[in-house]
Amino acid sequence: MKLHLLKSKIHNARVTSGDLEYEGSITIDQELLLLAEMIPNEKVLVVNNNNGERFETYIINGEPGSRVIQLNGAAARCALPGDEIIIMTFAVMDEKKARTFQPMVLIVDHLNNPKRRHRIGQEDEQLSSSI
């Protein structure tokens, strides 16, 4: 049996901008992607904490250090700049692997600077905002 599990998430991210004319996706600062163990073109589920909206899209690499979280295309209608969102990726694995897998959680501040990260079930790793 194959199960769909949380692979990683960026928690407390703030939308920095939107571009309705772009074909679609979410642009995320490359440094945040690396810390959260996410990759370009990966499918994401985004939850808007301000209005409850949930939507799927895919990741585009943003400029490293920019702290950009930009919604593009139709997704730009799902959240406004300043809205707090959670960005999640998922993986498919067999039940044996799923029982021991520990997702990566990256927590950012209100400016999308990385604060800390951890694998669920493990201690936080404090991060410097100068990453």
UniProtKB/Swiss-Prot annotation:
GO terms for cellular component: cytosol. GO terms for molecular function: aspartate 1-decarboxylase activity. It catalyses: L-aspartate + H(+) = beta-alanine + CO2. It holds the Pfam family Asp_decarbox. The modification Pyruvic acid (Ser) is found at S25. CDD domains: Asp_decarbox (cd06919). One of its GO terms (biological process) is alanine biosynthetic process. The active site is at S25 (schiff-base intermediate with substrate), Y58 (proton donor). It comes from the Bacteria. Is synthesized initially as an inactive proenzyme, which is activated by self-cleavage at a specific serine bond to produce a beta-subunit with a hydroxyl group at its C-terminus and an alpha-subunit with a pyruvoyl group at its N-terminus. Its cofactor is pyruvate. Pathway: Cofactor biosynthesis; (R)-pantothenate biosynthesis; beta-alanine from L-aspartate: step 1/1. Keywords: Autocatalytic cleavage, Cytoplasm, Decarboxylase, Lyase, Pantothenate biosynthesis, Pyruvate, Schiff base, Zymogen. Substrate binds at T57, G73, A74, A75. Binds 1 pyruvoyl group covalently per subunit. Heterooctamer of four alpha and four beta subunits. Belongs to the PanD family. HAMAP family: PanD (MF_00446). Catalyzes the pyruvoyl-dependent decarboxylation of aspartate to produce beta-alanine. This is Aspartate 1-decarboxylase.
